[in-house]
Amino acid sequence: MGSYLNPGNKGFRESLNSEIYVDKTGLIERTNALLDTREKYICVSRPRRFGKSMAADMLAAYYGQDTDSEALFQNLYIETCPSFREHLNKYNVVKLNMQDFLSASHSVQDMLGRIQKYVIFDLTDAYETIRYRDETDLVQVMKDVYAATKHPFIILIDEWDCLFREYQQDQDAQKKYLDFLRMWLKDKDYVSLAYMTGILPIKKYGTHSALNMFSEYSMINPREMAKFFGFTEAEVKNLCERYDRSFEETRAWYDGYEVLTVENNTQQVCELYSPKSVVEAMKSGIFDNYWNQTETYEALKVYVQLNFDGLKDAVVKMLAGERIPINTGTFSNDMTTFQCRDDVLTLLVHLGYLGYHWPDKTVFIPNKEIAQEYINAISMMDWHEVIDSINASKKLLEALWNGEEATVADGIDHAHSEISILQYNDENSLSCTIHLAFYTKKTIPHCTFPVRTR
C-alpha cells in the first residue's frame, strides 16, 4: 500500500462512519460494466460538494489490491450485484488528487514532474524485483509492471481540471497538461479503467478535444451517471423522514437541478439536490444558504458582471422565475473563452449556479439557496435598479398582506418601469415584473399569500 498506488479504504470508511451516508455504490456496477472496454475512459464533471471525491474514495476502496474491503460493502447495493466479488480488490489502483500536486508546485512542468516521480516511487517500491527499462518514465514503468504481473491499473484522478481554474490564461500550460494525460492514458493496455472527476468538462481546442477517448458525463448531459452524484428526490425524502424535516422546505431550498438520466433505455428527467446543503439542513434543522461555505459570491460576480450579449437581462428574468433558452454547444470548457452570453450561462451550469433542463434546452435559477447567491453577487455591483426592486419587494409583500391595493399597484408599476428590459404592454414582461416584485416571497421560508375574503 502506498500514498498513490493502492491507497487503501480509509477515505471510504470515513464516509461510511459519517452521520449521514447515502448509498451510491450503484456507480461501481456501472464502472464494472465498462472495465476493459472501449468505454473504459470516464470523465464526470459536477459542481463542488456533489460527492465526486467520495465516489473516487469508494472506487479506490473497491478495486484496490493490498486491502480487504468486502466488509465495508455489506448491506450496500453493490453487494447484491453479480459483478461484486469478480472485481473486488483485484486491481492496481493509482489515485491522484491533482489539486494537491498543483498546490505544491511552482509551475506546470514542476507539477507533472512531481506526479511522475511520486507514482514511480510507489510502483518501484511495490515491485522491487522487476527489471525496469527506464525508471524515470512513468509510462514505461507502468508497462513493465503490467508485463510482469498481468495486473492492470485503475486510474482515478480527482480535481482533474484544477489547472484550468488556476492557470486560466495560460494555454501553453493547459496543453502541456492535456498532452501528459493523453500520453499516460490513451491506448494503453495497462489501463482497465480511467476515471476523472472535476468541475469542468474536458477542454476543447477548436472543434476537437485533446482527450477524445473519454466519455463525458456533465451537468448538461449526465445520462446514466446522473443519480450517482447529488441526492435524488427519493433519497432526500428518506432523509427528511429520518430527521423529521419538511420535504417541501428542503425542495424549495436545495432542489432544482433537473438532469437527463437514462433508466432501462428510457430517458427521463431526474431531480437532483445539492448534497452538502441537504446534509447540513438535516443535521441542524436550519434551512439556510450553505452554498457560500464552498463558493463565494465573488466567484459568481466575476461572470455575471461580464454582461455578454444581454447576460444581465437574462439574470433578471431568471430571478423573476423565467427560463432562458441557450445553446451549450459553443462552450470551450474553460473559464475564460467566452464568445457570447450562452457560453457564460453554460459555465454557470457547470459551476452549479444554474439548472439546465435538457428537453427544452433552457437554464434557470434552481432554488432559494442559489437565488441568494445571485443577490449577494449583484448587491456588490452597479445593478441598482435590480437591487432596488428586490428591496422594494419586501415592502410590497407587506402591502399585499395588509390589503393595501393602491400600494401594491404602485409597487408593481415601479418595478416595471425600473427594469429596462421590460416592455410595458408585453404579457411575459408583466409576469416577469410581478415575479420580481414579489421576489421576497421566494426567499422567505413558509411564506404564502393569504386568501382575502369579503
Model-assigned labels for residue ranges:
Residues 1-434, 438-447:
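Phosphate-binding site recognition
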Residues 453-454:
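Short acidic loop-to-beta-strand element that houses the catalytic metal-binding Asp/Glu
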